[in-house]
Structures are given as structure tokens and as C-alpha cells.
A protein has these predicted regions:
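A structural helix-start
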Residues: 88-96, 116, 120, 124, ...
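Short, well-formed alpha-helical segments that are part of the catalytic scaffolds
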Residues: 69-70, 91-104
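Acidic donor-binding/catalytic loop of UDP-sugar-dependent glycosyltransferases
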Residues: 122, 126, 174-189
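Acidic donor-binding segment of Leloir-type glycosyltransferases
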Residues: 99-149
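Cell-envelope/extracellular polymer assembly enzymes that use nucleotide-activated donors
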Residues: 80-83, 111
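Short aromatic/hydrophobic "clamp" motif used to bind/position activated sugar donors
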Residues: 169
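N-terminal membrane-anchoring/stem segments of glycan-assembly enzymes
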Residues: 1-78
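Long helical/loop segments within the catalytic core of UDP-sugar-dependent glycosyltransferases
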Residues: 135, 139-140, 149, 154-156, ...
């Protein structure tokens, strides 16, 4: 109810502000219906831009404050066992590369669990070839495969979590890759018992087109900066 009231108040204030702007600047515009509509549209876009600028400013401010004050204890002997769960659906063309990136991680105490969510291509056959102990950066890494009927990503993740016996779980998509330092950098935060989850920095690999550049910008603003700002107020409600 409070959220609804806040939205109503915000909408009301913006509407009143827009009306006042149009009213006081109306004498300087042409008195045709088309011109009035055009002017009202420009004013609306201007107000929207102002709101966005304030939003980005406060996001950057709170993200900076959080990153500036956040500290964690360092323990060079803290390397808990981690299960990396990879749910896949029709990822036959990329799953091998994704698993190859996981085998290069700068970490030794982990396993990889592939969950095939009823794929209709050759995903199961490709994943099956990866099962067993594969050579990692420091030691052999166990790769397991769960084959289940299609039920969606959530059920696939739950199947992997149920299979895992590790202290920590890392979930990633079948068409994604992790940088080598991911586990070492992420796991160190869990030495603080108050930490419940850690999100990574999502980056777009194939930034060759305008669309992918815009997608990368969306990740930076919508995930990285926004989550850091939310962390300052202890209001993060979803990972990532």
C-alpha cells in the first residue's frame, strides 16, 4: 500500500509540475492544437530526462559510498568447496566452451554440475563427453551431468542444488563464461557470516554491434551500478 501511495504522490507531483510549466510558457507558443500537443510532448520528454539524470546521479552517489566504505576480512586459507551449477537447454554449440572456461578458474576446491533441461539438440551428447574428472588449473575437477525433462531454468537450478553437497553454490548460464579470478574474488566475501549472496560483474562478450553495446550499457547501469547502490541501503532484493 505504501508503495502504491508513493507512486500516486510522485505521479501527481509530476503531473502538476507539467501543467504549471505548460501554463506559464503557453503564451510563448502557437495557439494551434498541433503545436500544443507538440509542446506538451517536448515538456514531458524534458521532465523524463530530468528524472533520469537525478536517478543516475543518486545511483552513482550511493554506489560510490558503498564501494568506498565496504571492507571485508582477508583470510588466505579460506577456500570452501563450491559447486558450479550450469543449467542448459539447447546449448550444444557453446556448452563445451563454457565448461572449458570453468576449468581455467584460479581456484582448486570446486566441482561442475551440468543440468540438461530436456534439450532437443545435441546438448546431452556434448555434455556427456565432459563428464568425469577434467584437468583444471591446479587439480582435476569433477564434472557431473544431470539429465531431466524440460521444466524451466528454476527447476533445473533446484535439481543441481539438490544434487550438490557443497558449502557454496554458483549458478551460471550455459552460454556464459567466467573470468579466471571469479571464484577467488567472489568466495572471499563469505568469510563474513552476514553475507548471504554475491553477484558478479556481467559483461557482454560479443560487443560488435550497436545492439550489444546497448546491452552492455544496460548491464552496467541496471545491474552493476544499481546493485552497488542498493547494497549501500541494504535493500538488494535479487541477485544479480
Amino acid at each position: 500500500k505504501r508503495k502504491i501511495i508513493k507512486r500516486m504522490i510522485s505521479s501527481g507531483i509530476l503531473s502538476v509540475l507539467m501543467v504549471f510549466i505548460i501554463y506559464f510558457t503557453l503564451p510563448y507558443t502557437m495557439f494551434s492544437l498541433y503545436s500544443l500537443f507538440e509542446y506538451a510532448t517536448l515538456v514531458s520528454l524534458f521532465l523524463f530526462l530530468i528524472v533520469l539524470l537525478f536517478r543516475y546521479f543518486f545511483l552513482l552517489l550511493f554506489a560510490y559510498l558503498y564501494l568506498n566504505e565496504y571492507t571485508f576480512k582477508r583470510d588466505e586459507g579460506f577456500y570452501p568447496f563450491v559447486s558450479i551449477i550450469v543449467p542448459v537447454y539447447n546449448e550444444g554449440k557453446v556448452i563445451a566452451e563454457s565448461i572449458a572456461s570453468l576449468l581455467k578458474l584460479d581456484y582448486s576446491n570446486y566441482e561442475i554440475i551440468i543440468v540438461n533441461d530436456g534439450s532437443t539438440d545435441n546438448t546431452f551428447e556434448v555434455a556427456k563427453e565432459l563428464v568425469g574428472f577434467q584437468k583444471g588449473k591446479y587439480t582435476d575437477i569433477k564434472v557431473s551431468l544431470i539429465n531431466k525433462p524440460n521444466g524451466g531454468k528454476a527447476k533445473a537450478l533446484n535439481a543441481g542444488i539438490s544434487y550438490s553437497k557443497s558449502e557454496l553454490v554458483l549458478c551460471m548460464d550455459g552460454d556464459s563464461e567466467l573470468s579466471e579470478e571469479t571464484l577467488k574474488v567472489a568466495v572471499r566475501h563469505f568469510i563474513d557470516p552476514a553475507i548471504g549472496a554475491v553477484a558478479g560483474n556481467v559483461k557482454v562478450l560479443n560487443r560488435k554491434k550497436l545492439f550489444t553495446d546497448l546491452q552492455a550499457l544496460e548491464y552496467i547501469e541496471g545491474l552493476n551500478i544499481a546493485r552497488a547502490a542498493q547494497s549501500y541501503g541494504r535493500i538488494v532484493n535479487i541477485i544479480p
